[in-house]
Amino acid sequence: MPILLLKTLRDLRHRTLRSILTLFGIAIGVAGIVAISYTARNLAVAQTAVYADASQADLNIGTGDISPTIRNVLERLPNVALVEGRVVYYTRASLDPAAARWPDLRLTGIADFNAVQINRIELLAGRYPEAGEIAIDASARSLIPAEIGDIVYTRSRVGDRPLARRVVGFTRTPAAIDASILNQAFAYAPIADVRKEANLTGDNRLLFRLEAPDEAGTTASRISRILGTRGIPIGFVIVRDPENAEGRRELATLLQLLTAFSILGGVLSGFLVSNTISAIMAEEMRQVGIMKSLGAGRLRLIRTYLLPALLLGGAGTALGLPLGVLGGGALGTFLANLLGLRLPPPNLAPREPLLALTVGVGVPVVAAAIPAWRGAGTPVSGLVRSYGVAAARGRRFLDRLLRPVGRLSALGLMALRAVGRRPARSGVTILVIAISAAAFLATQTLDASVRGTVDNLYGIYAADAFYSVGRTVTPRYATDLSQLPDVARAEAWSRTAGFVGPLNVDVWGVPSDTELYRYRLLAGRWYSGQPREVVVSADHARRDSITVDQLLQVDIGDQRRPFTVVGIVDDESTYLGSVASGKLFMTVEDVSRLTYYGDGANLFALSLTRHDPAGVDEALARIELATRDVLPGTFAAYADKESTLQAVRVLTLLLRAMVTIVGIVGAAGSANTLILNVTERRREIGILRAIGAGRGHLLRLLLAEGLALGLLGLAVGSVLGYLLARALVDLTGASLFRLDFLLTPAIAASTAILAIILSIIASVGPGLLAAHLRPIEALRYE
């Protein structure tokens, strides 16, 4: 075995704990990068497969009751390759007919499960349902914990007689967000059963496959006109868009954030290697001096001390690559299940090993080159000179600055002076701690900003619930609802989907004198009630460069009408997976003219006397029972907010996992530095023990050093964390919705506590090492 390799292995074995900490940091950095790359690549493949799958609908149109005859007419239109009908009915389900809470259920009726060609579902267990039976999406078991053979009861409203169905299978709905996030279960039943329950004779959902998907907008307009001329209302039109698929932007944001933190982990591992090489060279200064005096050049010396970095990097890569692939597989499976995607079989693309080598070997070698170059360039006289223990108090500005500390605590003064003994090493350690603290502060700020923004956005809507009717009523029905004991105020609203050019928009009909929509004007004014006035949400105004007084062509169904933009409001609240580019607000009458509701109303916003979730649920149950003659349906506003917060919790969970890893690497870096300090100061420690310093004194000394490093790292990390938090909030806001930056004193305090705790924990090991060092061994060193 070459002598240089033997020397390197001896050096690494000589300081086993230090080498293990460095190896651990490299492996974690490699694993993080590989896991994110593996996850992102496989999820991209899964999303591409879903989009490329001929099963997916190019157009998804929600309609009123539509007969098979009209469906046949639509199938003969140009560019239409295939049309299939469904019945989608929103109801509630429970395993107990006497249960107090019934989760929301989207029940889809299919005519022939074995002949489905569009939006095919996958049968995971059991069989497809027949009359009186139901198949439940597997993700819905988090809301409805059913097993095959169980009886599931469904009812649309309080007071209805529950319908019993036997569970005969479990399915998987491709590209559907997990039921636990949406707080809505999915299930399938024979179309005849669902029609009967929904009181329909035909279908209410049309799925289209097109010959030229890029002409979907034109085809959708043609279909809307045909349905409009027949008086069939259109609830929404969804054009399949690979760049704006359901959940795509949320996933992209998550992966971007995870990538940022995995890069931080890789950078920290580089710092660990740099510290290790610096320590090896510091321990072997005399040997380096002798080699230089015998004619060894700088490059030869650098090669000598780059080999430990290569060995540590290679070993870290060997450990981190499989760990990253396993972690990426687990993370990918978790995210794929949330998004209804099927991952490809386990695989390894060239980019994962390349990334592993770059982070595991490239970063350590570059990090090691700096101390190696600096050490190899030191003059021989400086390398062979032996240092002693001398009184240097008062000789430097730092000593004079720290003199008050010495009056309070001699140990505290020694700890602070020890931090300044190796400025480069201490600086790197402080930076490692700072990055860890910054990562924690940034993620906590991002979480608080998202939650605070969600609270503010949903605070715009003062309605506690939305109330829909199955029979035609007039807007004056709001007065009847206001007379109910549980209702403080009721307003007739409306909601539908539309287009502004190629962009999907949510269209809201809201009274001009509303009290249940607390609009926040950014420009212009709220509409006065005059026809053809519209207020646009800020996100849509930005995307389409809309300004006040601009004329906007709005398409709803087969109707196109020009509207004058009179205002822009701050309202970017949206449901998870929404493909709408923003919101339009106009009078209820304008929406009715465009949707054939005439003088009828189908949606009411309710402010209730109680606002807590339990009180809202109880009030809605009583309201449904009191107004069952109009076939009401209710939706609690808190449920939509809870769905959004559930998605935020997933984001927060994964980010905190990454920050935990970064924090562990940071603690390892701090421990590494303290171990190096103990190693270099063995003679000093021996002298302290010889003159009477006890083990407790030495332990407190190392704890004080660690605390000093932690506090300095916290100071730097607070600044870096603020900048990083700003960047993360801006990045997330650009991908999802605009976020309000929220950095609270509690976040700053928790960051400080975490930095101090990690510093103390990292100091315990080196402190015990110093405390158990025998004086005779320390003074005999070298």
Task: Give the location of each predicted region.
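Peri-transmembrane interface segments
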Residues: 46, 222, 226-264, 280-282, ...
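Small-residue-rich transmembrane alpha-helices
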Residues: 270, 274-277, 286, 311-341, ...
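N-terminal Sec/SRP start-transfer signal
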Residues: 1-30, 297-299, 306, 310, ...
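Juxtamembrane segments of multi-pass membrane proteins
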Residues: 58-69, 408-530, 535-538, 547-550, ...
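Interfacial "coupling" helices/loops that link adjacent transmembrane helices in transporter permeases
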Residues: 15, 271-313, 669-708
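The feature marks short, hydrophobic/small-residue-biased sequence motifs that occur predominantly
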Residues: 36-37, 77, 84-130, 164-173, ...
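Small-residue transmembrane helix packing/gating motifs
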Residues: 53-54, 128-129, 174-212, 460-462, ...
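Alpha-helical transmembrane segments
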Residues: 9, 19, 28-56, 68, ...
